Curated annotation (Swiss-Prot):
It is an enzyme of class 6 (ligase). The gene is serS. Homodimer. The tRNA molecule binds across the dimer. Keywords: Aminoacyl-tRNA synthetase, ATP-binding, Cytoplasm, Ligase, Nucleotide-binding, Protein biosynthesis. It comes from Histophilus somni (strain 2336). ATP binds at residues 266-268, 353-356. Signal peptide: none annotated. L-serine binds at residues 235-237, 289, 389. Gene3D superfamilies: Bira Bifunctional Protein, Domain 2, Serine-tRNA synthetase, tRNA binding domain. Pfam families: Seryl_tRNA_N, tRNA-synt_2b. Its EC number is 6.1.1.11. SUPFAM superfamilies: Class II aaRS and biotin synthetases, tRNA-binding arm. This is Serine--tRNA ligase.
């Protein structure tokens, strides 16, 4: 959530900056109208409180003199009733302002390129050279069928479209990938591993910005009567980041760096007809998430570090990729700056997103009231939060199957994964 004070004091400037966000126009007139109502009611509340306090003192003095105070008491009671009414009106206006503020995306950083969609993203660099095959390249679906390791028909039978059953050595590689990523991030990159709930409450989803705007993209769990309403997590970013909600952190304890391997659940609303074949776009997929909680002045530096750590996974797996700086029209709702990592997919002859690494600035921290304080300082300030995929396990599996395929349909196991697969070098029939 954007700082309300910043909105009040720089409304026109903020509205102009947010015009570059795809599909969003800040309703300046509505916000201004609500803000005027807030000011009027705030002044009225303060005036009534002052008058009531003054009359209360008058009552005390009159009573001490033995005077009749019944009229004064009636006036104070009337003021009290009027004050309660005005307070209620003020609370309603403040709620409206907050609800409007919750729909406003984050302000893009100055260095983010202007653009309408992903065609305007800026490529930063490419790493690795796509392999030239001397045979007809198969996609991961065909390879999975040859090896008996990807069963989409079973996924449809058990659940429906955009589900799959992974079996045998391919399932083992899927597990190995997650273990490899976690070991890399905990042993070399300084992250603490977390095991978190896959079901979260709505307060948690508000904290990281999924609600109220993106409710249709979530799988909601209908509770029994009088029970808490839950949603399945769309990413481990949600529970892991919310661990610092309502906390005041000693700045000496920052940065906090946490990683988690979880399944992720997304309805893929708005994705009808896109990537209907294979593992690229599923309702359920695994991901290793990276989260950092940092001091405000260090968040841009932390974004570079976090992105480099996600890149390291691709480099160790020797998978060609490119790094892309997202434009204003393609960034996520809560991000101020985002890098996407896109891995080479031979059968599609293109790069596909495998990681998105974002600096959320104080956007989530304000929603969560996550603060930090320097030693000896009474004042607190909002932390900055960052997150990124390190990596999406299913898409990494797709990239390995296609980039490491052999002419007979077998798959060469990347060297860094072999210790996790009991030394297996080739996955064959």
């Amino acid at each position: 959530m954007i700082d309300p004070t910043l909105l009040r004091n720089n409304l026109s400037e903020i509205a102009e900056k947010l015009k570059v966000r795809r599909g969003f126009i800040l309703d300046v007139d509505k916000f201004s109208q609500l803000e005027e109502q807030r000011k009027t009611l705030q002044i009225k509340t303060e005036t009534l409180q002052a008058e009531r306090n003054s009359r209360s003192k008058t009552i005390g003095a009159a009573k001490a003199r033995g005077e009749d105070i019944s009229t004064l008491l009636a006036e104070v009671d009337h003021m009290g009733a009027e004050l309660n009414t005005v307070k209620e009106e003020l609370a309603n206006v403040l709620t409206e302002i907050e609800q409007l503020a919750l729909t406003i995306p984050n302000i893009p950083a100055d260095e983010v390129p202007l653009g309408k969609d992903d065609s305007d993203n800026k490529e930063v660099f490419r790493w690795g050279t796509p392999k030239k095959f001397d045979f007809e390249v198969k996609d991961h679906v065909a390879l999975g069928e040859i090896l008996g390791g990807l069963d989409f028909a079973a996924g449809v039978k058990l659940s429906g479209a955009r589900f799959a059953v992974i079996k045998g050595q391919i399932a083992r590689m899927h597990r190995a990938l997650a273990q490899f990523m976690l070991d890399l991030h905990t042993e070399q990159h300084g992250y603490t591993e977390a095991y978190v709930p896959y079901l979260v409450n709505h307060t948690t989803l508000y904290g990281t910005g999924q609600l109220p705007k993106f409710g249709e993209e979530l799988f909601h769990i209908k509770p029994l009567e009088n029970e808490q309403t839950y949603a399945l997590i769309p990413t481990a970013e949600v529970p892991v980041t919310n661990l610092v909600r309502d906390e005041i952190i000693d700045e000496a304890d920052l940065p906090i760096k946490m990683t988690a391997h979880t399944p992720c659940f997304r309805s893929e609303a708005g994705s009808y007809g896109r990537d209907t074949r294979g593992l690229i776009r599923m309702h359920q997929f695994d991901k290793v998430e990276l989260v950092q909680i940092v001091e405000p002045e260090k968040s841009m530096e932390a974004l570079e570090e976090l992105t480099n750590q996600a890149e390291k996974v691709l480099q160790l797996l020797n998978l060609p990729y490119r790094k892309v700086l997202l434009c204003t029209g393609d960034m996520g709702f809560g991000a101020t700056k985002t890098y996407d990592l896109e891995v080479w997919i031979p059968a599609q002859n293109t790069y596909r997103e495998i990681s998105s690494c974002s600096n959320m600035w104080d956007f989530q921290a304000r929603r969560m009231q996550a603060r930090c304080r320097a030693k000896g300082d009474k004042k607190t300030r909002l932390v900055h939060t960052l997150n990124g995929s390190g990596l999406a396990v299913g898409r990494t599996l797709v990239a390995i199957l296609e980039n490491y395929q052999n002419a007979d349909g077998s798959i060469t196991v990347p060297e860094v994964l072999r210790p996790y697969m009991n030394g297996i070098e080739i996955i064959g029939k």
